[in-house]
Amino acid sequence: MVTIGNAHDDLIHDAVLDYYGKRLATCSSDKTIKIFDLDGTDNYKLITTLTGHEGPVWQVSWAHPKFGSILASCSYDGKALIWKEQPETQQWSIIAEHTVHQASVNSVSWAPHELGAVLLCTSSDGKVSVVDFNDDGTTSHVIFDAHAIGANSATWAPVSTSSKDSAALKQQRRIVSCGSDNLAKIWKYDAANNTYVEEAKLEGHTDWVRDVAWSPSNLIRSYIATASQDRTVLIWTQDRDGKWQKQLLTEEKFPDVCWRCSWSLSGNILAVSGGDNKVSLWKENLQGKWESAGEVDQ
């Protein structure tokens, strides 16, 4: 485990490893993003500090390496910024600004690489936007109303086809969002109208849903986790019949607000972080019940 001390001058809101686990990007209320090189031991080196946001930076997301060394960030300033490293100079610069939202942009998430360079954003204006970065250098976006009081987070469904046809892949686009209306919603791309339509509404929380995570594994069934201010995490499963069933991760409420939830790459372990400054790990047993798999030690 690597501990990076005094990285920022204010609260750190996110820390994400790149695809290879060699670089760490962090972001903070100090309006900056920092990128560190990790060497697999306890050593790390600060590569660069990125400045460009005018407010706290809430989240960062690495693009798949097939698109280059690219990072997306979002901020209270209402912007999502796209940063790229030039391999020759190793200098980072802003290559795109996404400014369609009217309030804080709360999350950014790149689509599975099979779908192309596509970025998903949520905002306190209640809207979700999806931005396509096209091969010819142009961009196009779709923006739609999702959660009336504010959209807090969103993520992509895993791709379930090996098709290379771009039109067929676009039809595969499904996302799940969550918001301050206590709901999570599943959306499917509607090619005829070039928008996203609500496919399902996941009702079960009694307070704001702070985070949502769609498991990358969907071999047997689909799993979605939602983390809420009501101090619970719900696991939603979809079998072949298409209906979503909910289950409490644990019968006992968490000690504090559940801020984030995240699946392992294999999709069998869920990490939950909360207001008690702890990260707990959970795994489904053979009976379909979720049990503790320990905590991440600080």
Swiss-Prot record:
SMART domains: WD40 (SM00320). One of its GO terms (biological process) is positive regulation of protein exit from endoplasmic reticulum. One of its GO terms (cellular component) is endoplasmic reticulum membrane. WD repeats lie at residues 7-46, 52-93, 100-141, 146-197, 204-246, 253-292. It is a peripheral membrane protein. SUPFAM superfamilies: WD40 repeat-like (SSF50978). The lineage of its organism: Eukaryota, Fungi, Dikarya, Ascomycota, Saccharomycotina. It is found in: Cytoplasmic vesicle, COPII-coated vesicle membrane; Endoplasmic reticulum membrane; Nucleus, Nuclear pore complex. Belongs to the WD repeat SEC13 family. InterPro entries: Sec13/Seh1_fam (IPR037363), WD40/YVTN_repeat-like_dom_sf (IPR015943), WD40_repeat_dom_sf (IPR036322), WD40_rpt (IPR001680). This is Protein transport protein SEC13. Component of the coat protein complex II (COPII) which promotes the formation of transport vesicles from the endoplasmic reticulum (ER). The coat has two main functions, the physical deformation of the endoplasmic reticulum membrane into vesicles and the selection of cargo molecules. It also functions as a component of the nuclear pore complex (NPC). NPC components, collectively referred to as nucleoporins (NUPs), can play the role of both NPC structural components and of docking or interaction partners for transiently associated nuclear transport factors. Keywords: Cytoplasmic vesicle, Endoplasmic reticulum, ER-Golgi transport, Membrane, mRNA transport, Nuclear pore complex, Nucleus, Protein transport, Repeat, Translocation, Transport, WD repeat. GO terms for molecular function: structural molecule activity. Has antigenic properties. The keyword Lyase does not apply. It comes from Candida albicans (strain SC5314 / ATCC MYA-2876). PROSITE patterns: WD_REPEATS_2, WD_REPEATS_REGION. The COPII coat is composed of at least 5 proteins: the SEC23/24 complex, the SEC13/31 complex, and the protein SAR1. Component of the nuclear pore complex (NPC). NPC constitutes the exclusive means of nucleocytoplasmic transport. NPCs allow the passive diffusion of ions and small molecules and the active, nuclear transport receptor-mediated bidirectional transport of macromolecules such as proteins, RNAs, ribonucleoparticles (RNPs), and ribosomal subunits across the nuclear envelope. Due to its 8-fold rotational symmetry, all subunits are present with 8 copies or multiples thereof.
